[in-house]
Amino acid sequence: FITAAFGIPQISTGDMLRAAIKAGTPLGLEAKKIIDEGGLVRDDIIIGMVKERIAQDDCKNGFLFDGFPRTLAQAEAIVEAGVDLDAVVEIDVPDSVIVDRMSGRRVHLASGRTYHVTYNPPKVEGKDDVTGEDLIQRDDDKEETVKKRLAVYHEQTEVLVDFYSKLEGEHAPK
């Protein structure tokens, strides 16, 4: 909705990493191992990808970050780079709900169609509605991995709420 209303791109570090993984790039292979274990890809890699992306022409009138920044170092790097943010939104969801939503997700790899075992189940359990092919659970959607990711969030990302609430001056979200 926001991207369409303002004619700006959504910048998702997760999507960028998944594309690198799918392409089998060295970054993608390194990222896959870290993500599958529930960890976060190194800040320098993410920051470099984001800086490169926001320098592209379609970002000249703005952009919407999705899932970025995730660490204090990433947030500080964006401020140091002179990137002004108009707003920062925190969506607060209980861990139990996140675990349920993510671990219930199933994907048809060839098309990208996404289902959920409870909220949007396929007509036939474990099968894509269109092709009848198998659905998979991504490694990063497995319950234990989601719980590890949440622990990392609480340790590394929650501090951003405080960081942005205290940010003053020209780089503070308006």
From Swiss-Prot:
Domain comment text?
A: Consists of three domains, a large central CORE domain and two small peripheral domains, NMPbind and LID, which undergo movements during catalysis. The LID domain closes over the site of phosphoryl transfer upon ATP binding. Assembling and dissambling the active center during each catalytic cycle provides an effective means to prevent ATP hydrolysis.
Q: Which cysteines are joined by disulfide bonds?
A: none
Task: Please list where the region (LID) is annotated.
Answer: 104-141
- Is the Transferase keyword given for this protein? yes
**Transmembrane residue ranges:** none
Report the top EC class in one word: transferase
The name this protein carries in UniProt is: Adenylate kinase
In the Enzyme Commission scheme, what number(s) does this protein have? 2.7.4.3
Cite the binding residues for ATP.
Answer: 105, 114-115
Q: Explain the purpose of this protein.
A: Catalyzes the reversible transfer of the terminal phosphate group between ATP and AMP. Plays an important role in cellular energy homeostasis and in adenine nucleotide metabolism.
Task: Supply the Gene3D superfamilies for this chain.
Answer: P-loop containing nucleotide triphosphate hydrolases (3.40.50.300)
Species the sequence originates in = Neisseria flavescens
As for subcellular location, the record says:
Cytoplasm
Q: Which reaction does it catalyse?
A: AMP + ATP = 2 ADP
The residues the record assigns to binding AMP are: 13, 18, 39-41, 67-70, 74, 138, 149
What's one GO BP annotation on this UniProt entry? AMP salvage
Q: Where is this protein chiefly located?
A: cytoplasm
- What family is reported? Belongs to the adenylate kinase family.
Describe the protein's quaternary organization and the partners it interacts with.
Monomer.
